[in-house]
């Protein structure tokens, strides 16, 4: 099961069965993905659950509580964070409201930057999970494989913090 709170081209996904993909609700709700992943695992304990989420949504999703519940209820979930060290939603809405405003003139828009980026992989470790930070493309697949091994074999939660290039829309 894939709980996705990150922009995705759904047509590129290889998901063919109904009920295997849960995407952004039309009503919004930044941070909903982590709680939804817990619910998906509770509803389908025999299925693997992956939560793909941006760094801003991860922070909004109350990660300490999520990882605590995952450990306490023995819900092995893989969390994959696309970490570009910014709140894209905040930046986009600010630019749409004030296209020539203060934020549009800055290299690092106020209230949209998440730099320095927290070490999210440490948050999951506080609740008995496996956490890794990926900074190079060649590290990604091995990190995902190690994380899935923890989820499948050790029945623990895992998190891969994928650090992306920081960029801002002008």
Spans of features found by a protein language model:
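Thiamine diphosphate
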Residues: 9-170
């Amino acid at each position: 099961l894939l709980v996705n709170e990150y922009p995705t081209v759904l047509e590129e996904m290889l998901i063919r069965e109904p009920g295997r993909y849960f995407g952004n609700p039309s009503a919004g709700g930044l941070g909903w993905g982590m709680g939804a992943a817990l619910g998906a695992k509770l509803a389908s304990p025999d299925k693997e659950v992956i939560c793909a989420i941006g760094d801003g949504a991860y922070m909004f999703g109350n990660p300490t509580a999520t990882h605590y519940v995952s450990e306490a209820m023995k819900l092995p979930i893989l969390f994959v964070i696309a970490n570009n060290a910014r709140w894209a939603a905040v930046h986009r809405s600010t630019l749409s409201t004030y296209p020539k405003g203060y934020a549009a003139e800055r290299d690092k828009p106020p209230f949209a930057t998440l730099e320095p980026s927290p070490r999210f992989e440490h948050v999951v470790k506080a609740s008995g999970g496996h956490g890794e930070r990926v900074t190079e493309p060649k590290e990604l697949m091995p990190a995902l494989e190690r994380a899935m091994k923890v989820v499948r074999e050790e029945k623990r939660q895992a998190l891969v913090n994928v650090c992306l290039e920081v960029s801002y829309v002008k």
